[in-house]
Amino acid sequence: MKIVIDSNRVIAALIQDSTTRQILFDKNFEFFAPEYIKGEIDKYRKDIIEKANIKEEEFEVLLSLIFEHITIISKNEYQDILNDLGNIIKDTKDIAYFAVCIFVKADGIWTHDLHFKEQKRFKIFMNIDMLWFSRNTNSDI
């Protein structure tokens, strides 16, 4: 199953060994993200390290492991799609996630940002949905 992952799910996986991290390492999913996700993570680096109560080196190792499971899509690859999406949601920086969803023909976007649900064109998944898909891999979305 192809899933575009929002930065809030990566941050959650970095902060705590939780359901989010288990989903991220689940082989039933193929994760994609726009390249700007790395900047988003870096912007909150100090907060993540503090909340996770880990050292910088541990953060780097964990981040590296997580990004082994995410294919980063360059803005050059989805640039043309951005123009077609217009203002699909209020937070325009998040439009890149929708563009990547189209570009890779993903099944949906995994996020806990509720404003993603303001639009009806793309499927938005939360942890509970991802857990269900993981346990029912042969089912339709």
Regions found by a protein language model. Name each.
Residues 26-28, 35-84:
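PIN-domain endoribonuclease scaffold, especially VapC-family toxins
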Residues 1-33:
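Short, well-structured N-terminal submotif of metal-dependent ribonuclease cores
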Residues 31, 52, 124-128:
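Short hydrophobic/aromatic-enriched beta-strand-loop microsegments
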Residues 13-14, 40, 44, 119:
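Residues that scaffold the ATP/ADP-binding catalytic core of kinase and kinase-like folds
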Residues 17-20, 25, 45-47, 123-126:
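Short, glycine/charged-enriched secondary-structure capping and boundary segments
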Residues 102-141:
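Acidic, PIN/NYN-like endoribonuclease modules and their adjacent C-terminal/linker elements
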Residues 71-108, 114:
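Active-site neighborhoods of divalent-metal-dependent phosphate/nucleic-acid chemistry enzymes
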Residues 10, 37, 97, 115-116:
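Alpha-helix capping/helix-boundary segments
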